[in-house]
Amino acid sequence: MKTQFAILLVALVLFQMFAQSEAIFGAIWNGIKSLFGRRALNNDLDLDGLDELFDGEISQADVDFLKELMR
């Protein structure tokens, strides 16, 4: 039982290291891509993608949820 637990812990640590390194490598790669070419520079300055993040409509369910949080 102890060996299985130790193997599980080692596997979790290795998986976490892999997930974090993949994110770091992705950020580094995006940084390298943004250094080369005008397209990447123009894409970084394009703020139209931020319009999708804002939803101006609040549904009744959202209002009820906020009221529940504020109690």
Curated annotation (Swiss-Prot):
The record marks W29 as: Important for antibacterial activity, and hemolysis activity. The modification Phenylalanine amide is found at F36. GO terms for biological process: defense response to bacterium; killing of cells of another organism. IsCT2F is an enzymatic proteolytic cleavage product of IsCT2 by the proteases present in the venom. GO terms for molecular function: toxin activity. GO terms for cellular component: extracellular region; membrane; other organism cell membrane. It is found in: Secreted; Target cell membrane. Keywords: Amidation, Antibiotic, Antimicrobial, Cleavage on pair of basic residues, Cytolysis, Membrane, Secreted, Signal, Target cell membrane, Target membrane, Toxin. The keyword Repressor does not apply. Residues 1-23 form the signal peptide. Residues 40-71 form a propeptide. It comes from the Eukaryota. Expressed by the venom gland. IsCT2 shows weak hemolytic activity and antibacterial activity against both Gram-positive and Gram-negative bacteria probably by forming pores in the cell membrane. IsCT2 adopts an amphipathic alpha-helical structure. Belongs to the non-disulfide-bridged peptide (NDBP) superfamily. Short antimicrobial peptide (group 4) family. This is Cytotoxic linear peptide IsCT2. It comes from Opisthacanthus madagascariensis (Scorpion).
